[in-house]
């Protein structure tokens, strides 16, 4: 969802048809707002809750809850770091000025041509979508992946280690090599899933 990708708030959904809003990579900081309080309320009501976030957000949730809940399942990611939402907002403003149209959606990793050499894509209200280039060519993605504007705490992250707070850890399987008899890399994307707990 474009608004989630702009850091305007975390989204929780209860219907299966609403889940597509949560798909795709979003490389900007999200605001948790009342997310933790909402989760605690749902857990106490006996609802099953799946929380997905960065490792530090997952750790923060567990610290907030102060106890384990059997009806909570947590998922984190192998995190590169979280870029400044101000930088992203400024970048969107630049695109809107350059293309003379408001941005209605932004895809950080469009895989139309390639998973590995993915493109960024901006969709505008008054014109066709614009492919902004591969991550090496797009200004925002290049700065993000070269660590130019991550949050200060990300440079000394204490959660980027093998021990995890989450039940499940997900990531892209970069560096996968099929030469040892594995399935072929078709450049459509390979995911890694680590189960860290019995629940996971």
Predicted regions and their residues:
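Single conserved hydrophobic/aromatic residue that forms the stacking wall/gate
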Residues: 1-12
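Glycine-rich phosphate-binding "P-loop"
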Residues: 10-37
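A short alpha->loop->secondary-structure connector
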Residues: 15, 66-81
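Generic beta-sheet signal
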Residues: 47-53, 72
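Gly/Ser/Thr-rich loops at beta-strand to alpha-helix junctions
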Residues: 51-61, 81-83, 113
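Short, surface-exposed basic-aromatic patches at helix termini and helix-loop junctions that form
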Residues: 62-73, 92-97
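Short, charged, surface-exposed secondary-structure boundary motifs
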Residues: 82-91, 180
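Long, compositionally biased charged/polar accessory segments in the mid-to-C-terminal portions
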Residues: 96, 101-200
